[in-house]
C-alpha cells in the first residue's frame, strides 16, 4: 500500500477544520496551521454564525460600481479607503471593474451556487458525529430593508430566482408576523426558510476541532 498523502491547511477556522475533517474521511493525513489556537477571537469566533447556502450573489456585480462613491463619502458607510494606498491598489481595482459585468457575475454566482448547495448536507454529516444540541437553530433567516422600493434588491432577487434558490419576498405585515419585536421601519424583506444560524459559533468550532484531533 502506498504512503498516505499529507495535506496542510492554513487556518483553524470553520472552513479549515471542516475541510480537514472531510479530507480525513478520504484517508488523507491532515495538518492544520494557524498562529492562534482554534476558537481564538477571529472570524469563526465572533461572526453572525449563518448557514447561508443562498448567498451565491457575488460582490462583483454591475450595480456595485454606482454604490461605491456613496459608500466612500458616507461617514457611516461600510467601505473605507486609505487614499495614500490608491496607487498600489489600482491594478487590482481595474481588474475588479472588468469583472463587474452581468456575464462575469452570473459565472461566479452559478459556480458559488453549486458549491453552497452542498453546504447544509455536508454540515449535517459532520454534526452527526458531534453533540450540537441547542447550538444550531433552524428558524430561517430574514433580510429586511427600509427602502420603499424593491429596486435596490431587484438584482440579487432575480439572480437567486434564476439559480433556483428557495426565497420568499415578504410584505411588512409578514415581517411583523415573523418578528413582532422589530421596530416597523422596514418596507420589505426576503425570507429564506431553510436558513440556519449558530447560537455559539465558537462552541461548534471547538467541537469540530476536537473531532479532528481524535481522528
Predicted regions and their residues:
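Short, glycine/charged-enriched secondary-structure capping and boundary segments
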Residues: 23, 45-48, 65-66, 157-159, ...
